[in-house]
């Protein structure tokens, strides 16, 4: 599916431009044009990505973030129950993309699943956090080089805990770009 190759492409470009930082940058609030907002390190730039409603990239830190919206109405139109839990939705995504692992709650109560992929220039680890509002499921995926991932896991959980979703549909649905 398009997400796999897009994740690989975005992360490969990021990994090639990664530089080590001596200390963590300041936290700032990002308000995306979709209405989604989150707090994370300064230095991220908005990034358009086909098949996603948006994203961010920080080349200095080697981190990319992609945001996807899947409307409940679109799920219902293809016979999938939009009333499923976040855990069920996570398993649905993992099945769709052939990913192995488990859907879990992190130490801060965020629902997520984690997976690794080989990309040009190395291995990447993906932390996919799951949300829902009144009209859609949302997936916000934080990506980094696998060898940096353990050191970023807590940071990603903290950032994920700050996410606020838009109240209306954005309009871009996974697989319908």
Model-derived regions: residue spans:
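Stable alpha-helical elements in mature extracytoplasmic
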Residues: 40, 85, 89, 152-159
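Bacterial N-terminal signal peptides that target proteins for export
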Residues: 1-7
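C-terminal motif of bacterial Sec signal peptides marking the signal peptidase cleavage site
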Residues: 16-19
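Conserved polar/disulfide-associated segments of primarily extracytoplasmic proteins
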Residues: 50-139
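Short, well-structured beta-strand
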Residues: 111-177
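Structured segments of extracytoplasmic/periplasmic soluble domains
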Residues: 43, 47, 92, 96, ...
């Amino acid at each position: 599916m398009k997400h796999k190759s897009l994740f690989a492409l975005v992360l490969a470009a990021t990994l090639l431009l990664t530089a080590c930082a001596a200390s963590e940058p300041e936290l700032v609030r990002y308000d995306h044009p979709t209405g989604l907002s989150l707090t994370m390190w300064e230095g991220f730039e908005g990034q358009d990505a086909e098949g996603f409603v948006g994203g961010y990239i920080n080349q200095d830190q080697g981190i990319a973030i992609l945001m996807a919206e899947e409307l409940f109405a679109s799920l219902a139109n293809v016979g999938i129950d939009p009333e499923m839990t976040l855990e069920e939705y996570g398993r649905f995504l993992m099945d769709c993309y052939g990913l192995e692992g488990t859907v879990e709650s992190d130490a801060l109560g965020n629902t997520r699943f984690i997976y690794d992929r080989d990309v040009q220039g190395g291995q990447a680890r993906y932390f996919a956090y799951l949300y829902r509002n009144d009209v859609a499921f949302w997936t916000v995926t934080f990506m980094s080089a696998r060898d940096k991932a353990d050191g970023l896991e807590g940071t990603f959980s903290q950032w994920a805990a700050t996410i606020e979703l838009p109240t209306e549909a954005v309009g871009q649905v996974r697989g319908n770009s």
